[in-house]
Amino acid sequence: MDKARKLEIIKQYGRSEGDTGSPEVQIALLTERINSLTGHLKVHKKDHHSRRGLLMMVGHRRGLLNYLADQDIERYRTIVKQLGLRR
């Protein structure tokens, strides 16, 4: 993910200008990295170090989603629908 794509995601999912810390932005950025790494692992099946990193990112995203669901269920439903996550 290059800098331009990262700024685009922050702008799309941020609650205000320059918002990088909200759960929505963090979830969207992690989803982008997860999707990228998933493609890498389809080609490089024996890259177990990257697979561990992927599993850690998925766990981190799961924690952020659980936090958002506890805090504001509508924001949670919106981000899950926008990103097309299975829940």
Curated annotation (Swiss-Prot):
It comes from the Bacteria. One of its GO terms (molecular function) is rRNA binding. It holds the Pfam family Ribosomal_S15. GO terms for cellular component: cytosolic small ribosomal subunit. InterPro entries: Ribosomal_uS15 (IPR000589), Ribosomal_uS15_bac-type (IPR005290), uS15_NS1_RNA-bd_sf (IPR009068). PROSITE patterns: RIBOSOMAL_S15. Keywords: Ribonucleoprotein, Ribosomal protein, RNA-binding, rRNA-binding. GO terms for biological process: translation. One of the primary rRNA binding proteins, it binds directly to 16S rRNA where it helps nucleate assembly of the platform of the 30S subunit by binding and bridging several RNA helices of the 16S rRNA. Forms an intersubunit bridge (bridge B4) with the 23S rRNA of the 50S subunit in the ribosome. Belongs to the universal ribosomal protein uS15 family. Part of the 30S ribosomal subunit. Forms a bridge to the 50S subunit in the 70S ribosome, contacting the 23S rRNA. PANTHER family: RIBOSOMAL PROTEIN S15, BACTERIAL AND ORGANELLAR (PTHR23321), SMALL RIBOSOMAL SUBUNIT PROTEIN US15M (PTHR23321:SF26). This is Small ribosomal subunit protein uS15. It comes from Clostridium botulinum (strain Alaska E43 / Type E3).
